């Protein structure tokens, strides 16, 4: 993880999850590294991602877009259905991509205007925290208490796809700072 090639390989292996890697990652040292990452299971994905990104942030600026392009190519089919794949890709893009543009102007002044978006994001977080329905429901209810109108329920996992998360997060970014605070807390 301290060498750029190893860090790239770990990043790609994490994003692929249990999908068979492409030929370039099935040979030599890369294949061994992919196998090691797969054997570690899911609990170490985020710590491994942190270590890999720390190394990749030191990569030459002209190499970073290449890494991101390869990552997007590897994850293109899965990113829209697999929440973890989407999250890993988004984290890598944030750390390795070009500096972010300014935040959108806060023009949403009521939580009710973004209730659907809150429901999508917090449902995804609840399912990511625990796949057992009872635990996910309990977590969702605790997190959204006072944020959502009565009657808003935990969405099924298939309704919390990255296709719905991206626009929901973009709309929540437009909330005024005072309304963002309870969402973050």
Predicted regions and their residues:
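Small-residue-enriched hydrophobic alpha-helices in membranes
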Residues: 1-76, 83-185
């Amino acid at each position: 993880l301290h060498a750029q090639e190893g860090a790239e390989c770990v990043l790609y292996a994490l994003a692929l999850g249990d999908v068979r890697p492409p030929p370039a990652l099935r040979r030599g040292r890369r294949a061994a590294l992919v196998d090691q990452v797969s054997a570690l299971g899911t609990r170490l994905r985020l710590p491994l991602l942190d270590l890999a990104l720390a190394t990749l942030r030191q990569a030459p600026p002209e190499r970073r877009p290449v890494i991101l392009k390869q990552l997007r190519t590897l994850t293109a089919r899965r990113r829209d259905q697999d929440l973890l794949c989407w999250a890993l890709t988004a984290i890598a893009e944030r750390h390795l991509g070009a500096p972010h543009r300014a935040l959108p102007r806060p023009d949403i002044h009521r939580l009710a205007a973004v209730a659907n978006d809150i429901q999508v994001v917090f449902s995804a977080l609840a399912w990511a925290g625990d796949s057992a329905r009872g635990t996910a429901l309990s977590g969702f209810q605790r997190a959204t208490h006072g944020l959502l109108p009565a009657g808003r329920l935990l969405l099924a996992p298939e309704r919390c796809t990255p296709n719905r998360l991206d626009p929901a997060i973009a709309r929540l970014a437009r909330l005024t700072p005072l309304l963002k605070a309870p969402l973050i807390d």
